[in-house]
Each structure stands twice: as C-alpha cells, then as structure tokens.
Amino acid sequence: MALKPEWKGYAWILLATVTGSTVYVFSKAALIEVSLFQFGFWWFSMAIGWNLLFTLRSPESRRIRIISRSTFKVLLIMGLVEMVATGAFYAAIEASANPSIPSFLRNMEYIFVTLLGIILLHERFRGWEIAGVILSITGAFVISYQRGGTLSSYLTGSSGLMLLCTSFYAIRTILAKKFIHTISPTQMAINRALFLFTLATVLLVVFGQSIRIPQSALISILAGSFLGPFLTSISQYSALKYIEASRAAIIQSTTALFTVTGVFLYFGKLPMAYQAVGGIITIGGVMLIMAGARLKATGESRNAKKMPTA
C-alpha cells in the first residue's frame, strides 16, 4: 500500500532529523584532528560524490534539464548564503567543547524564519508565536551563559557563530521552500556541496594547507558526509514537497535530543545541567512558534472558505 503524501513528508523529515544529529558527532570527531579547511575539502568533495551517485540511480534526477537564467540566479544566491551559513556552522562545532551545544542553538533558525516572514511577507504575530520567540531567545541565552564572559568572547565563540549561521540558514530555508517545485532537491544539494567545496579548496590553497589527513579523520568524514551533506539535505528538501515547513520544523527542532545521545555514546560527554535546560526551553519555544503558525494558517483557510463567491 502506497504511503499518503503527508506520511512521506513525515518519513523524510524524521530521517533528516536522525541523520542530521550524527553530523555534529562525526564532524567534531574529524575537526579534532584536522583544520576546518581540510575538513571542508574532504567533507564536501565526498558529498558531491554521494549526490552524483544518487543522481545516476534516480530516473527523475537523470533527466537533463536546461537551467534557466532565473533558476541559475536562485542557485547562485543559495550557494553564497550556504557559504556563510555552513562555514559558520562547522566553525561553531570546531570551537565548541561539546557539539551538543551548537545543536541546541541551531533552533534559533526558526526565530529568524519567523522574523523574516514579518519583514518580507508582512505577516503578523499571534500570541503563541510571540511567546515562542521569547522562550527560544531565553533558552539561547541560558545555553550561551558564560561566567565572566564578554561580548567579544560571545560573538567570536560558538554562540556568536551559531547566531550568524542560523540567520543565514533562515534565508536558505525560505528560498528552498519558495523554489522547491522548480528546482529539484538533488539540484539544491549538489549546488550546496559545489559551492562549499569550492570555498574550502580556495581557502586550503590560500593558507597553504595539505589535503593529507589521518585515516581516522577520513573515516569520520566518510560516514558524516554521507549522513550529512547528502542524506540530510536530500531528506530535508524532499520533505518540503509533501508537508508544510512548520510541520517539518517542529520535528527537526528535536535534533538536539538525538545529538546529545550520540555525543554521549561517542565522546562520553553530556551538556551542563543549565545548558540542557536552556536547550529544552528553545525546543519548547520552537514548538510554540510553529503551533502559532499552524493556527494562523488554519484560521486564514477558514476565513477564505467563508468569503462569498461571485
């Protein structure tokens, strides 16, 4: 029996959530041994390979499509946004002693998605959404708390990098949702990997670093690049074809819970008690934001049905 489209969407986003949590574990394991530029070179070169293999096996993806000028512009913008967002993301993981912390802070993306909706689409906040934003920001501050820390140390540390990362990821999310029916998930994933591989290669050459890395780091990158840039990206973009972004966001907000488990099993580390509390607060905030968005959408749908027809 074929799955309903909605259930396909839930299956895709659940897969993206679980595989996405492993990215924090494998990338941190590799970044302990190699530089950020070496990591990016191997991580995204492998991601390109995984995506090309998937393209060859998929009849839909094998169809040659001529990319229009407008599509090229969108892919260019998305690629540049990914350079900033993903570069800051992995820099945050490298800077953090426990990769669970960036995974909790990743939920700030939904705050920026909501704010961009207000700025670009002139949307209005509901009470639940306001409460969710306040709760998420509170949780982020709790997670980022450092006794004796300065604004400079915050901005250059893991928390500041995640602030930069999530603001740009929000732009990426809105672009992906808008163009998901004209640009395939595979095209988006390959475009992302190509831009990031190019950036890492240029920086590797500029700073005169070698592409030779330890075998243990290569194994971590091999596993992580399959689960992260390939499987997570394909799953995220595929889910958006079947379910609303708000539903996907609610499920993906729990990624940090899977990450905590993975980090504990791999590194034997757990977040501090106050960091765990802050993380749970941010997850609760995201769920309130998305619940408010769904209530608003439901209300607008009902009002549209009540409108008289000519």
Region spans (language model):
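Membrane-interface helix termini and inter-helical loops of multi-pass transporters
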Residues: 25-33, 61-64, 91-98, 144-155, ...
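Hydrophobic transmembrane alpha-helices of multi-pass small-molecule transport proteins
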Residues: 116, 128-147, 200, 253-254, ...
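Specific transmembrane alpha-helical segments of multi-pass solute transporters/efflux pumps
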Residues: 19-23, 59-100, 105, 142, ...
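Specific alpha-helical transmembrane segments that line the substrate/conduction pathway
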Residues: 38-49, 90-124, 245-265
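Hydrophobic alpha-helical transmembrane segments of multi-pass integral membrane proteins
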Residues: 7-15, 37-57, 72-77, 132-135, ...
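Hydrophobic core positions of alpha-helical segments in small-molecule transporters
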Residues: 15, 42-43, 105, 128-131, ...
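Hydrophobic/small/kink-forming positions within alpha-helical transmembrane segments
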Residues: 18-21, 25, 79, 83-87, ...
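Glycine-/small-residue-enriched transmembrane alpha-helix faces in small-molecule transporters
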Residues: 1-42, 84, 88, 151-178, ...
